[in-house]
């Protein structure tokens, strides 16, 4: 069986540029996911609210070339999961859709829908409540900031944009 891994490309918007370079430098291969940072202060009361992360991302699945002895690899776009971090319980928040399944063609800003279990919760800029996880819990070996991401037919269409 050949080793498969993932590469995460991050297009950071102005409001999140300070967090992600530091997170990339300090990440550990022992982590199951890549932590995301809130890019705005958000107050959550009675209705669900979207927490923005200030980034657009692309996850690539990387596989060694089949039947080859070379170091060449095949890279393909991959779906990924947006999951709450275990520490989210301290915030009084609950992810409204339990797990976010992000299509490989999505090119909009990442956001997480949350409910307040207390009826009055807040999120501050820089809070880490969510993470990107590879679909098979695979290793996100490389994370890098990029200046652009390739366009897709879907583009930035967000929640519910591909059907009811």
Where are the predicted features?
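DUTPase catalytic domain/fold
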Residues: 1-164
């Amino acid at each position: 069986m050949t080793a498969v891994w993932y590469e995460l490309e991050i297009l950071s918007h102005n409001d999140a540029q300070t967090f992600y370079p530091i997170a990339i430098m300090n990440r550990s291969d022992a982590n199951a996911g890549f932590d995301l940072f809130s890019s705005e202060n958000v107050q959550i009361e009675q209705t669900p609210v979207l927490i923005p992360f200030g980034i657009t991302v692309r996850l690539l699945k990387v596989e060694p070339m089949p039947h080859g002895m070379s170091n060449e690899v095949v890279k393909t776009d991959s779906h990924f999961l947006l999951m709450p971090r275990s520490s989210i319980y301290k915030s009084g928040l609950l992810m409204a859709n339990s797990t976010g399944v992000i299509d490989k063609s999505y090119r909009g800003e990442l956001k997480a829908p949350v409910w307040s279990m207390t009826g009055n919760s807040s999120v501050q800029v820089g809070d880490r409540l969510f993470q990107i996880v590879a679909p098979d819990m695979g290793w996100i070996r490389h994370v890098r900031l990029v200046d652009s991401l390739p366009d897709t037919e879907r583009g930035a269409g967000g929640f519910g944009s591909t059907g009811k």
